[in-house]
Curated annotation (Swiss-Prot):
A motif (Walker A motif) lies at residues 58-65. Mg(2+) 2 binds at residues 364, 420. It comes from the Viruses. HAMAP family: TERL_T7. GO terms for biological process: chromosome organization; viral DNA genome packaging. Its EC number is 3.6.4.-, 3.1.21.-. A motif (Walker B motif) lies at residues 156-161. Belongs to the Teseptimavirus large terminase family. Residues 344-429 are annotated as: Nuclease activity. This is Terminase, large subunit.
Amino acid sequence: MSTQSNRNALVVAQLKGDFVAFLFVLWKALNLPVPTKCQIDMAKVLANGDNKKFILQAFRGIGKSFITCAFVVWSLWRDPQLKILIVSASKERADANSIFIKNIIDLLPFLSELKPRPGQRDSVISFDVGPANPDHSPSVKSVGITGQLTGSRADIIIADDVEIPSNSATMGAREKLWTLVQEFAALLKPLPSSRVIYLGTPQTEMTLYKELEDNRGYTTIIWPALYPRTREENLYYSQRLAPMLRAEYDENPEALAGTPTDPVRFDRDDLRERELEYGKAGFTLQFMLNPNLSDAEKYPLRLRDAIVAALDLEKAPMHYQWLPNRQNIIEDLPNVGLKGDDLHTYHDCSNNSGQYQQKILVIDPSGRGKDETGYAVLYTLNGYIYLMEAGGFRDGYSDKTLELLAKKAKQWGVQTVVYESNFGDGMFGKVFSPILLKHHNCAMEEIRARGMKEMRICDTLEPVMQTHRLVIRDEVIRADYQSARDVDGKHDVKYSLFYQMTRITREKGALAHDDRLDALALGIEYLRESMQLDSVKVEGEVLADFLEEHMMRPTVAATHIIEMSVGGVDVYSEDDEGYGTSFIEW
């Protein structure tokens, strides 16, 4: 054998024995920059066979899927009899990984032995490597989490981003996903070398990965975009922080706190831009990989404090009893709240009803771009505020949006349109007024929002919700969830009013999108005076006035039922025809 052949054999042997070396060669062949320190550390963790059941979490854009696909090829090169199952939230994502694995095999000449041979499986979604023995299961198979998982056995299961916004936004969706991933136990070969590797970024505070860690014995290894910023964040990471980052941080925590972990990939300026784009909560989830956010003090607004009910469009009970027990939980509406934050209807309500008093349409205008023009229709009665409709429109205050808003005002018979004066000189009012008049005759009032938005929203909504004075029409919740879409028209729960409500904090920039929530808060601020009513006391006063008035009338025999409205309260009584001014006698 020639000297060059010897050198080549030594290099190949080194690559086969060292995944990091293999990664450097592959990155060079793909014309990618040299692997960064976090990518190298990630490769070392993947190659460590002692990690049998673990969750690899790394900030968005680090290339964890690419590195894992490279690891699959390297593993098959070392042991062609391995069976590897790749599962993703969608079949397209799983297939993309499978295609990339095949491309790696085709790209590197020294891997030519792994190319499928005649008679072996050789498709995008299922293929064998050349030296593999005939087997019921292919060497590599890709499948979506809702696809045909059964019928395959695997030495290594790689779950790559099985949790995405669309399958984790509601409690029902999260429970379904949890049921699906429990199938992995039946697919994994019962061997000491078998492994399950999750790759992912938390999508919600109730992330699947937290459940796996708490209830299924998985360990989590995290590469956040920044070193721990606070003592609390450092406590959360604890031993979850990647070993390399943990050693670096512990050596000099004061200097490293809040600095980029991989400045070659994302420097401070890059990460500041992403924090503005995602909002503080979104950045903490997707770049800091910290789902440990769901405490009542941080998130002051909870769905369980509101009353959800099917509402009459003309009148409502004068008083409700709120009791958040199991029998009052509503389970057939999409719930985007935090874990344990259920939707509840009322426990009981008054037999007396009254017609709604104030009716307003509140609008939070926006410019063009990612923001919506948020709106809410609010009614009041006896100290309660009723949310009858809410939503958002694109295109700022285009003619189409203004026409739709004017039609909403007519549909709900509002007495006043309230709008935020965030365009200076009442510009929105001047533009909207003539269009509104074409459809509906009502007053228009401008309201100026003051102070930091997040503080104002929380301070306005928290007392209303904690005293259970916000009543939400049930259809609002369903329509809000279905209409939550991003600028490209794709469903995005971050545009939902109730997602915004349950994720806002008093920190500046807490939400990337808050238009629908801001409209609701503006409306409740406008209606603040009506909230100061004591509903039970007012109901009693109205009834007392009715009785006092009728006690002054002469009594007669009663044979007929009559109905009247007094002080906004519907009253049913019996009276003789022709004695409308007389009191009843039994």
